[in-house]
Amino acid sequence: MMLHAQHMPGQPGAPSLVFLHGFSGDCREWQSVGEQFHGCSRLYIDLPGHGGSTAIPVGGFADVIRLLRATLISYNILKFWLVGYSLGGRVAMMAACQGIPGLCGLVVEGGHPGLQNEQARAERRLSDGRWAERFRREPLTEVFHDWYQQPVFASLTAQQRQALTALRSQNNGETLAAMLEATSLAAQPDLREALNALAFPFYYLCGERDSKFRALAQEVAATCHVIRNAGHNAHRENPAGVVDSLAQILRL
């Protein structure tokens, strides 16, 4: 089995870029950024429970990484960079720390490296469980209205919240809930030590108004790029700034 994806071929010899979206996003999320790198092969993946991969069930990160590997093989992508936002960033970090073959570099935007104690994990498990129950039972417009009131999204304007709520409400609540539980931050190990031992380039992007993830970026051995005029979802709020950072990283 493989994940649904959109593939755009590039020039021979150019790096392949594999883009992973955040929770409730889909393969279109990164395209405004990725399509500025038309010399590179670009693969935009729908994670399980999302977009064209809605019907693909997973029990945890191991299943997601296995599906990611199978998808890359199916497109004959043997050397690549992973670029992931939030949930996609956590999947990318997990894949990197598990030694996914062919990975040349890692770019994470607003991805958490992992909780550091059992109390924090227990609290997160309860919180994600409550959200999952709401995704299963309530209209998605109501759930996402509240979702985007969380502190991490404090920099969004009312208009941005409204647009995101409308966009994300096109999802399937049941499969979102299942993916939220399967890939909860509570189920993710603390990756700091493994990330600090990576043998290939690791870059971290965060919006200048995203104080939580700017602080987390200092806890891993990554080169940090702060995206101006942006909060947690920097590639949506300032795509040109993220394009500039990626161009520097990839030296294109």
From Swiss-Prot:
Matching InterPro entries: AB_hydrolase_1, AB_hydrolase_fold, SHCHC_synthase_MenH
Catalytic activity: 5-enolpyruvoyl-6-hydroxy-2-succinyl-cyclohex-3-ene-1-carboxylate = (1R,6R)-6-hydroxy-2-succinyl-cyclohexa-2,4-diene-1-carboxylate + pyruvate
Keywords recorded for this protein, A-Z: Lyase, Menaquinone biosynthesis
EC number annotated for this UniProt entry: 4.2.99.20
A Pfam cross-reference name: Abhydrolase_6
GO molecular function: 2-succinyl-6-hydroxy-2,4-cyclohexadiene-1-carboxylate synthase activity
Keyword set includes Flavoprotein: no
Keyword Lyase appears in the UniProt entry: yes
Pathways involved: Quinol/quinone metabolism; 1,4-dihydroxy-2-naphthoate biosynthesis; 1,4-dihydroxy-2-naphthoate from chorismate: step 3/7; Quinol/quinone metabolism; menaquinone biosynthesis
GO biological processes: menaquinone biosynthetic process
Function summary: Catalyzes a proton abstraction reaction that results in 2,5-elimination of pyruvate from 2-succinyl-5-enolpyruvyl-6-hydroxy-3-cyclohexene-1-carboxylate (SEPHCHC) and the formation of 2-succinyl-6-hydroxy-2,4-cyclohexadiene-1-carboxylate (SHCHC).
Subunit structure: Monomer.
Similarity comment: family membership: Belongs to the AB hydrolase superfamily. MenH family.
Protein name as it appears in the record: 2-succinyl-6-hydroxy-2,4-cyclohexadiene-1-carboxylate synthase
